[in-house]
UniProtKB/Swiss-Prot annotation:
It comes from Escherichia fergusonii (strain ATCC 35469 / DSM 13698 / CCUG 18766 / IAM 14443 / JCM 21226 / LMG 7866 / NBRC 102419 / NCTC 12128 / CDC 0568-73). This is Adenine deaminase. GO terms for molecular function: adenine deaminase activity. Pfam families: Adenine_deam_C (PF13382), Amidohydro_1 (PF01979). Belongs to the metallo-dependent hydrolases superfamily. Adenine deaminase family.
């Protein structure tokens, strides 16, 4: 196997270094001098008083010794507290339904200066072309958009139909790209544990970079084996003791708070002064409505401080420095001489009230980002084109026959969690013995002409109507849930007509729908417009019953076989604990 080039080492040219040194010595003029500022010390705790001198994209010096230093431009921080730019340790930008350009516009003014992104959603739909587009966006972004090379396309071989493959040869072509930091989440953890050569080949090929994990609920010898293969982190932990054990075994813990998977309350009590360098924050999947109304990583920091009494320097440490160290991004994560000048000025550090953001040494203006968004998106050459190769359906496509007295498996939803339970329900002439059981179906959309895979869903809260979407992890086939076959067909046909998207049907009519023209995953609308459309969708969905907080994101994970316990793919009902297909009828 070829040896990887470690692009995590950040190089400063000799000329840049000399210019920085001259300013640090007090012999040259800085580009910017941030005055009337207090720096939060993430290493020792406490604060550092004094200005921040900036040359180009780097910090030349900090502290009172730079009072009145010569500079081309002074920035009066008005007593603000300066912290390093926030870093999201693991996310799929596609889950925001925004393009990378729009995502930057929405999150950079909130202090999110760096993201570690796995674009496996779009790669599952269109293969290497999707990864190439994300790389183009990363190259032109002001935000530091780093990429982990998608490792499991599809998530689990032989379990679902997806739109494309992403071979090891294709992956290796991107390994040495300057925006690539490693190998994305290795979801086939049973294959890694059993030593499948195809998976070990991928781990070996990226061994000099960061190897992301994915092992919800794993423990014992299996967890030891998974870590022994070289896996370095996990963002799927949902239990306190699970997270503690992973830390004990040398794993880094990504504490996730997304729109559907909400694990911060369970895992935040683990964070302390000792282990905080091994703890990071991530969102994984967060929708535009929450970003607009609650925030992104800034919202997670706020909750650590206000709800879990995490000390300020520790909360901001896990939001920046810990992640930068883990991914070898040693030029990021601290406000210190020689580091990149990614700086967030806070008028209130406890409430994470962002006053101003600088990235790569330049102040960010939200209005400028918005004004340039359309042109920058066009420059990135998005991969437009209809990816829905599916003919319209009819109610008869969702017909299921049930025998009175028989017991049938039900996917039981846990609100605000990605895991499900595998339950069962007995059918009688009056229906099922549980009032909350509705229907679910997954339809492949890549031209294979498979019949819909149908099943039963409980606990979702759908009392009437139907919801359909082409966002369904990770293969992104069409998923639909409903109380009647007629309304399910209506919802599916609307997203087919839209070329992909989300839809709510109630009372036999489409109540709200959102087209997603890029891969059936992303909109080209502005962040504000998208948030408003999501608001309308959620309002329409709430009329269908007491659904999860984020019904479409929760629904999107009902077809992901690598998260237990029971899921439905385009090929049938899948037992995520036995890693095998099972039957709708309970026969044993």
């Amino acid at each position: 196997m070829d040896q990887a080039i470690n692009h995590k080492i950040h190089y400063i040219s000799r000329q840049q270094r000399q210019e920085i040194l001259a300013i640090a010595r007090g012999e040259a003029v800085a580009d910017y001098l941030i005055e009337n500022v207090v720096i939060l010390d993430l290493i020792n705790g406490g604060e550092i008083a004094g200005p921040i001198a900036i040359k180009g994209r780097y910090i030349a010096g900090i502290g009172s010794e730079y009072n009145d230093a010569p500079t081309l431009q002074r920035i009066d921080a008005h007593g603000a507290i300066a912290v390093p730019g926030f870093i999201d340790a693991h996310l799929h930008i596609e889950s925001s339904m925004m393009t990378p350009v729009t995502f930057e516009t929405a999150t950079l003014p909130r202090g999110l200066t760096t993201v570690i992104c796995d674009p496996h959603e779009i790669v599952n739909v269109m293969g290497e072309a999707g990864f190439a587009w994300f790389a183009r966006c990363a190259e032109q972004a002001r935000q530091n958009q780093y990429l982990q090379v998608s490792s499991c396309v599809p998530a689990l071989e032989g379990c679902d139909v997806n739109g494309a493959s992403f071979t090891l040869e294709q992956m290796l072509a991107w390994r040495d790209h300057p925006q690539v930091t490693g190998l994305a989440e290795m979801m086939d953890y049973p294959g890694v544990i059993s030593g499948q050569n195809a998976l070990l080949d991928k781990l070996d090929a990226f061994r000099h970079l960061t190897l992301d994990g994915h092992c919800p609920g794993l423990g014992g010898k299996e967890l030891n084996a998974y870590i022994a293969a070289g896996i370095e982190n996990c963002h799927e932990s949902y239990l306190l003791e699970e997270g503690r054990r992973k830390l004990q075994l040398g794993m880094s813990l990504m504490i996730r708070e997304g729109s559907a998977a909400r694990n911060l309350n369970a895992l935040a009590p683990l964070i302390n002064e000792f282990n905080s360098p091994q703890c990071m924050l991530c969102t994984d999947d967060r929708n535009p409505w929450e970003i607009a109304h609650e925030g992104h990583i800034d919202a997670l920091i706020r909750r650590l401080i206000e709800q879990h009494n995490v000390p300020l320097h520790v909360a901001y440490r896990v939001a920046s420095w810990s992640t930068a160290r883990h991914f070898g991004l040693n030029h990021l994560g601290l406000l210190a001489p020689g580091k990149q000048a990614d700086i967030v000025l806070l008028s209130d550090a406890r409430k994470v009230t962002v006053q101003q953001v600088l990235v790569k040494g330049e102040p960010i203006d939200a209005q400028t980002l918005q004004a340039e968004e359309s042109a920058r998106l066009a420059q990135s050459a998005p991969p437009y084109g209809n990816t829905i190769a599916r003919q319209p359906v009819s109610a008869s496509d969702f017909a299921l026959q049930f025998t009175p007295g028989k017991r049938y498996r039900v996917i039981d939803v846990i609100h605000n969690e990605l895991i499900t339970h595998s339950r069962s329900s007995v059918y009688s002439e009056n229906g099922f013995d549980r009032d909350d059981v509705c229907f679910i179906a997954v339809l492949e959309r890549y031209g294979q002409r498979l019949d819909p895979a149908c099943g039963l869903l409980g606990g979702f809260g759908l009392n009437e109507g139907a919801l359909a979407a082409t966002v369904s992890h990770d293969s992104h086939n069409i998923v639909v849930i409903g109380r009647s076959a007629e309304e399910m067909a209506l919802a599916v046909n609307q997203v087919i007509q839209d070329g992909g998207g989300l839809c709510v049907v109630r009372n036999g009519q489409v109540q709200s729908h959102l087209p997603l023209p890029i891969a059936g995953l992303m909109s080209t609308d502005t962040a504000q417009s998208l948030a408003e459309q999501i608001d309308a969708l959620k309002a329409a969905a709430r009329e269908c019953g007491p659904l999860p907080d984020e019904p479409f994101i929760q629904m999107a994970f009902l077809s992901l076989p690598v998260i237990p316990a029971l899921k439905l793919t385009s090929q049938g009902l899948f037992d995520g604990e036995k890693f095998a297909f099972t039957t709708l009828e309970v026969t044993e």
